[in-house]
Regions:
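Active-site Asp-x-Gly
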Residues: 61-64, 221-225, 230-287
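ATP/Mg2+ or Mg2+-diphosphate-binding catalytic cores
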Residues: 190-200, 294-329
Length: 329
């Protein structure tokens, strides 16, 4: 999908500034999949390419909700340059491959909204590579495991968004598990209001959530986690390195949160990323919480005009059934 004429003109000026050399923008196409920001591939007249991230309200398919702009909530939407740059800097410092930044514009020099132009990595994402050639994906998975280990080893004494914690701030809640429980209860209420199957099981799901949370023991150090590191959020560069994208939600949190998401998204392909020492009580709580989140979130997104509706409805349906399976007698 091409951008609006006004957006294209803004991207043209930014692309010239980012890439230099007298180049002119020849084409700009929105890349499918982005739901919180506009992601455009920019093609210049000499075939040089780059990616533009545009954090504009018109590019965000998610309905607004109270607390969206409260960055002390680790799960508030990851929007804007401040979060992106803080996450990018932390991952680079840890040796995790991310797209190189070519230009940032937070002052409206090119666009009224926050804008970043970054390196284009036009090859496959990890999910496509795993489906096409598992043997070729094996070394990429091994390197991804190394990146995850570097993130796991870097600890902070408090949890929250990297931009907040690295800036000396603190986050709401008493602990990771309390924040997750509160969020899961909200997701449960929202899903129950939209689907009678969840409504019928609401009391049992709430009882299970509270019981699992009560089993979690306190923790005082937190690792770096991406939070949504599915195979579509890992690109593969020309030499086979995994490249993390959609990094704005990067936070210090329980590492189990990351591994639950990886298990859900990768299924059997998760095995090369398995690690020892994960807390089984946290894994149990976070698994149910994420199943509820992946039910309520897609149903909420479908209230708007998100284009890939069939896929999003399928995600909600699958995770709804998985959540119910977790309380089956």
């Amino acid at each position: 999908m091409a951008p609006r004429a006004e957006t294209r003109a803004q991207l043209a000026g930014a692309a010239r500034a980012a890439l230099g050399g007298g180049r002119r923008l020849e084409a700009a196409e929105r890349i499918a999949g982005g739901s919180k920001k506009g992601v455009y591939r920019l093609v210049m007249d000499d075939s040089t390419t780059a990616i533009a991230y545009l954090w504009d309200d018109d590019e965000n398919y998610w309905p607004t909700a109270e607390g969206d702009d409260d960055l002390t909530d680790p799960f508030a939407p990851g929007l804007g340059l401040d979060l992106f740059e803080a996450a990018h800097a932390r991952l680079v410092a840890l040796g995790v491959r991310v797209p190189a930044i070519r230009l940032v514009d937070r002052d409206g020099a090119h666009c009224p909204a926050d804008l970043a132009i970054v390196e284009d990595l036009p090859g496959e994402n990890l999910g496509d590579l795993l489906a096409r050639d598992p043997s070729a994906a094996a070394p990429v998975m091994a390197r991804l495991g190394e990146s995850l280990e570097a993130m796991r080893r870097h600890r902070a004494p408090t949890y929250g968004k990297v931009a907040v914690v690295d800036g000396g701030g603190s986050s709401l809640g008493k602990s990771c598990e309390s924040v997750v429980l509160d969020r899961a209860l909200r997701d449960l209420a929202e899903a129950a209001s939209r689907d009678p199957r969840i409504a019928g099981a609401r009391d049992r799901l709430e009882e299970r959530l509270r019981g699992l949370a009560a089993e979690v023991r306190p923790r005082t150090e937190y690792a770096v986690v991406h939070g949504e590191l599915g195979p579509d959020h890992v690109l593969v560069d020309a030499v086979g390195n995994p490249v993390a994208i959609d990094i704005e939600g990067l936070m210090y949190f329980d590492v189990e949160w990351e591994h639950v998401f990886l298990r859900i998204r990768l299924h059997d392909d998760y095995r090369p990323l398995e690690v020892d020492g994960l807390d089984e009580d946290r894994l149990a709580l976070y698994t149910l919480a994420q199943r509820l989140s992946l039910t309520a979130g897609p149903l909420r997104l479908l209230d708007g005009d998100f284009p890939d509706r069939e896929s999003m409805a399928g995600i909600a349906e699958h995770n709804l059934n998985q959540a119910l399976e977790l309380i089956r007698p």
